[in-house]
Design a protein with these regions (language model features):
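Surface-exposed, charge/polar-rich loops and edge strands
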Residues: 11-17, 24, 212-214, 220, ...
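Long, highly charged, low-complexity intrinsically disordered interaction regions
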Residues: 8-13, 17-106
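Conserved hydrophobic/aromatic pocket- or pore-lining residues that grip, position, or stack substrates
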Residues: 169, 206, 241
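Short HxH-centered metal-ligating active-site micro-motif
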Residues: 179-220
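C-terminal extensions
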Residues: 13, 30-42, 56, 61-71, ...
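Structured, non-catalytic alpha/beta "coupling" segments that mediate domain-domain communication
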Residues: 113-123, 157-159
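Divalent-metal-activated hydrolytic enzyme cores
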Residues: 183, 226-259
């Protein structure tokens, strides 16, 4: 992409963010003179007390989003926006996984609101990844699957990542190998093997998602995995598994006897 194209994209992004900021300000201004402001403050306090006294399980999904949005745009009633967001994305999980640009496009939201939502996902993923990084992968397998599902199940494009492991199956690097369209991301055997050698990896785990939601491996997935496994075997690099993530669950090619 040339400089003019990059500049154009930057301008479009800036315009989208500016538009979102204006939307947040207008929403707040429209609600600042609301006669029910005292009720709103009381409602916020009750929501906060329920959270502190009984934990997150005491709140419905839209109430969790409502509370988050109150932190970003505190002068308005955020319940209608929260309900609209849950309805639009279908679930709290899908909302948290939505990309920032998609969030900013929603009525009443802007960069501040989007960042408030995304930081929750970032914190959740960081928490889920801790045991994966602290223990040998094969000893923390369920933790790995939980982390991968939280991170990838709701992606709208196909993403391929590779987990590179040392001889003790400790994670060396977790890298995105490629991203593609709705249902296609290229995986290049030579590049993955070369990267394994560069990192001194003794083993790898392949991971990719199916945006369709179906985690069952395709024939192409199986053939490509076997090709990488054969290439790695010649150089002493094991392919422990190929994990496929979908909204309906997770598939392991190793568990299915496909590698």
């Amino acid at each position: 992409m040339g400089e003019s194209g990059a500049s154009c994209n930057a301008c479009l992004c800036q315009m989208a963010c500016s538009g979102g900021e204006i939307a947040e300000k207008r929403t707040a201004m429209a609600a600042s003179s609301d006669k029910d402001s005292n009720y709103g403050e009381g409602h916020r306090e009750r929501l906060r007390d329920r959270l502190l006294d009984n934990g997150g399980d005491a709140l419905l999904d839209h109430e969790i989003v409502e509370y988050l949005l109150m932190l970003a745009i505190p002068r308005i009633d955020t319940k209608p926006i929260a309900k609209q967001l849950i309805a639009h994305y279908g679930s709290l999980t899908a909302l948290l996984a939505a990309d920032a640009e998609s969030l900013i496009r929603q009525k009443g939201l802007g960069p501040r609101s989007a960042a408030t939502i995304k930081i929750v996902q970032a914190a959740a993923l960081r928490m889920l990844s801790e045991p994966v990084r602290a223990l040998p992968i094969l000893a923390s397998w369920q933790s790995l699957l939980d982390y991968l599902r939280a991170d990838m199940a709701h992606l709208t494009i196909e993403r391929v990542r590779v987990l590179y492991l040392n001889s003790k199956n400790m994670l060396i690097r977790d890298e995105i190998a490629s991203e593609g369209s709705l249902d296609q991301a290229a995986i290049y055997t030579r590049e993955i093997i070369r990267r394994s050698i560069d990192l001194g990896a003794a083993a790898i785990i392949l991971v990719h998602n199916h945006p369709s939601g179906d985690s069952a491996p395709s024939r192409q997935d199986i053939n490509m995995t076997r090709e990488i496994a054969d290439a790695g075997k010649k150089l002493g690099i094991a392919v422990h598994d190929h994990v496929i993530v979908g909204k309906d669950g997770i598939s392991s090619m190793r568990s299915a006897g496909l590698i």
